Curated annotation (Swiss-Prot):
Region forming the signal peptide: none
Location(s), subcellular: Golgi apparatus membrane
The protein's Enzyme Commission number: 2.7.11.1
Source organism of the structure: Drosophila melanogaster (Fruit fly)
Gene Ontology cellular component list: cytoplasm; Golgi apparatus; Golgi membrane; nucleus
UniProt topology in membrane: Peripheral membrane protein
InterPro entries membership: CC_SR_Kinase, Kinase-like_dom_sf, Prot_kinase_dom, Protein_kinase_ATP_BS, Ser/Thr_kinase_AS, Tyr/Thr_kinase_Cdc2_inhib
Gene3D superfamilies reported for this sequence: Phosphorylase Kinase, domain 1 (3.30.200.20), Transferase(Phosphotransferase) domain 1 (1.10.510.10)
The protein, known as: Membrane-associated tyrosine- and threonine-specific cdc2-inhibitory kinase
Length: 533
C-alpha cells in the first residue's frame, strides 16, 4: 500500500514574492529572549524547605520522594509520600517511588524538558501517563521554574478541555508528574486519518478555543500550541490542551521571562519580543490550517514568512469551505491587533450552533441516563410488587387447600342381575375393593366383576404386569402349603356373593375378606388342580 505523505509548500523562485526584511528592520529585530532564572521561589510550604537551597540539601533528603502541591499552600509541615502495600514490599529493593508504584509500559513522547511514559499503577491496575524531567535540578531557581508547571496543571486540571492532573513528586533531583492517559495526540490522529472531515475540524476548534479561553481569562498565555500538545480523550471526541511548561503571565512575559515554542507555529511578533494572547490565536490558526489541508509546515525560510504575512497557498486553501477559510485567515493575520480573541471566535455562528447542539445532546444524554435509572428503579419496584403479590396468592391458595373439608370415600355397590334372561333370580352385587399386599404395588383398583366373567380368578395371564418396585421372593414350601392356603381363601370367600345369604348388602361387604395376592403377582408358580368331590 502506497504511503501518503503531507505535501510540502511550493517553492517561490521570484524575489518579489520573498518577504525579506530590510536593513532598518534587521537593526530593530531582536533575537527570541532566552529563559532567564526567576527572582522568586515558587515552592509549596507543605512539601519543600525554603530555608535550604538545592546544593545544601543532604543526599538522604534528595533520595526521599516528596509530594509537590500548591493546593494546600497554608500547610507548613513537610511530608513525604504515603507508602502503599506494594511499595512496602518493594522498599527493600532500593527502588525509586516511581518504580515501586508504577509499571512502565511504553514511551509516549519526548520533549525538551522531559519524557512521557505510559504506566500501570501497581495498586489499582489503572493506566496513567507520567512525565519525568530529563535534566537534574541545577539549582533552586531552576527547580522553582520546573515546579511552576505543577502549579499550572493544578490550576487548569478541572477544565473539560485541559488535561486532568493527578499528583506530582520529586526524588533524586527529578520531577515526576502523574496525569490522565489520553488516547492519542492530534498529530497522531492526523497521520492516522490523513483526511479529517471538516465537521470534525470545527469540533476540534471549538474544544481548543474553550480551553484557550480558560487560560486567557486568567491573563495567561500558552506559547506552545501545536498538534503534539493537543490530546484526544478516552471518549475519542474531546480534545484537551496539554504541556503547560511554557505557560506564563502576560505581564511577566514581556519582561523577558518567556520562551518561545515550536518555530513552525510561532507568531511573527514573537521574534520582536512581543508576547500577547494573540500569539496563541495565531498558533491555533496555523494548527487548524495544517489539520484541514494536511500540509507540512515549514520551520523557517521564505515559505515560513509567506504564512506570517497572510498569504496562504491556493492549492491547499481551496480544499476547505469558504467559512473555514475566513476563520483561519482571521486568526493568522500579521497584525496581532486585528486577530479575534478566543471569546470573539466562540461567538461565530458556526461555533454557536455547535455549542447549542452539544448542549442539547448533553441534556438529552442526561435525560436518557436519568430515565434509564428511573426505569430500573420502577422496574425493580414492580418486580418486588409482583413477588409480594405472588407470595400472597400462594399463601391464600394454601389456606384454601387446608380449609377444604375431607370426605371419606364409600364403596360403590351396584346391584346387577346375574343373568339377563333369568327371572326371579336374586341379584348379585358388584363390589369395588382394592388389593393390598406386602409387595409395594402402584395403587390399582380391582373390581369383583373382573372375576365374574367365567375366568379363573387365579389366572393372571391376562391381567397385565403391575409396576412392582421390588422382586417377589420364591416359594420354598414345596407348593403344598401355598395350595392349601389358596384353596382355603377361595372356599372361604366363594366366587359369588349372594344377597339373600345376608340380611343386608352391607353385611355382605363386612363379611368379605381382603384377598392377599402379593405372593403370586410376578408369575404363576404352579397350576391348580381340583379333585372331583
Amino acid at each position: 500500500m502506497e504511503k501518503h505523505h503531507r505535501l510540502p509548500l511550493p517553492e517561490l523562485h521570484d524575489d518579489k514574492h520573498r518577504h525579506k526584511q530590510c536593513n532598518g528592520e534587521n537593526s530593530n529585530r531582536f533575537r527570541p529572549p532566552k529563559y532567564k532564572t526567576r527572582g522568586y521561589v515558587a515552592v509549596d510550604n507543605n512539601n519543600l524547605n525554603r530555608s535550604q537551597s538545592l546544593g545544601s540539601c543532604s543526599t538522604n533528603s534528595s533520595q526521599i520522594a516528596h509530594a509537590i502541591s500548591f493546593r494546600d499552600a497554608g500547610c507548613s509541615d513537610s511530608s513525604t509520600l504515603p507508602s502503599s502495600p506494594v511499595q512496602a514490599e518493594l522498599s527493600t529493593l532500593s527502588l525509586s517511588h516511581f518504580e515501586q508504584c508504577f509499571e512502565r509500559l511504553a514511551k509516549l513522547g519526548e520533549g525538551s524538558f522531559g519524557e512521557v511514559f505510559q504506566v500501570r499503577d501497581r495498586s489499582d491496575g489503572q493506566l496513567y501517563a507520567v512525565k519525568i524531567s530529563k535534566q537534574l535540578f541545577r539549582g533552586e531557581q531552576y527547580r522553582a521554574e520546573r515546579l511552576e508547571e505543577v502549579r499550572r496543571y493544578e490550576e487548569f486540571s478541572g477544565h473539560e478541555n485541559c488535561i486532568r492532573f493527578i499528583r506530582a513528586w520529586e526524588q533524586y533531583d527529578r520531577l515526576y508528574m502523574q496525569m490522565e492517559l489520553c488516547r492519542e495526540s492530534l498529530e497522531q490522529y492526523l497521520l492516522r486519518c490523513q483526511r479529517i472531515p471538516e465537521e470534525r475540524i470545527w469540533h476540534i476548534l471549538l474544544d481548543l478555543l474553550r480551553g484557550l479561553k480558560s487560560l486567557h481569562d486568567r491573563n495567561l498565555i500558552h506559547l506552545d500550541i501545536k498538534l503534539d500538545n493537543v490530546l484526544i480523550g478516552e471518549d475519542d471526541e474531546t480534545c484537551k490542551l496539554a504541556d503547560f511548561g511554557l505557560v506564563i503571565d502576560v505581564d511577566r512575559a514581556n519582561s523577558h521571562h518567556a520562551t518561545e515554542g515550536d518555530s513552525r507555529y510561532m507568531a511573527p511578533e514573537i521574534l520582536q519580543g512581543h508576547f500577547s494572547k494573540a500569539a496563541d490565536i495565531f498558533s491555533l490558526g496555523i494548527a487548524m490550517l495544517e489539520l484541514a489541508c494536511y500540509m507540512d509546515l515549514p520551520s523557517n525560510g521564505p515559505l515560513w514568512h509567506e504564512l506570517r504575512h497572510g498569504i496562504l497557498p491556493e492549492e491547499f486553501i481551496n480544499k476547505i469551505s469558504l467559512e473555514l477559510q475566513s476563520v483561519i485567515k482571521s486568526m493568522m493575520k500579521p497584525d496581532p491587533a486585528q486577530r479575534p480573541t478566543a471569546e470573539q471566535l466562540l461567538s461565530h455562528p458556526k461555533l454557536q450552533y455547535l455549542q447549542k447542539k452539544r448542549k442539547s445532546l448533553m441534556n438529552f444524554s442526561m435525560l436518557s441516563r436519568s430515565f434509564r435509572r428511573s426505569r430500573r428503579a420502577v422496574w425493580g419496584r414492580m418486580c418486588n410488587w409482583k413477588t409480594a403479590a405472588f407470595r400472597y396468592l400462594l399463601y391464600f391458595l394454601e389456606v384454601l387447600h387446608l380449609c377444604k373439608p375431607i370426605t371419606a370415600s364409600q364403596p360403590n355397590i351396584n346391584i346387577v342381575p346375574s343373568s339377563p334372561s333369568s327371572k326371579g333370580v336374586p341379584l348379585v352385587p358388584q363390589v369395588e375393593f382394592q388389593l393390598v399386599g406386602s409387595t409395594p404395588i402402584a395403587n390399582r383398583d380391582c373390581y369383583a366383576s373382573d372375576f365374574l366373567s367365567g375366568e379363573d380368578p387365579l389366572d393372571l395371564s391376562n391381567q397385565g404386569s403391575p409396576n412392582v418396585i421390588n422382586s417377589t421372593p420364591l416359594n420354598t414350601n414345596q407348593g403344598k402349603s401355598r395350595l392349601d392356603l389358596l384353596k382355603n381363601n377361595v372356599d372361604s370367600m366363594g366366587r359369588y356373593v349372594h344377597v339373600h345369604d345376608f340380611e343386608s348388602p352391607c353385611s355382605a361387604l363386612s363379611s368379605a375378606k381382603v384377598l392377599d395376592t402379593s405372593s403370586f403377582r410376578r408369575k404363576k408358580l404352579f397350576v391348580l388342580e381340583y379333585d372331583d368331590e
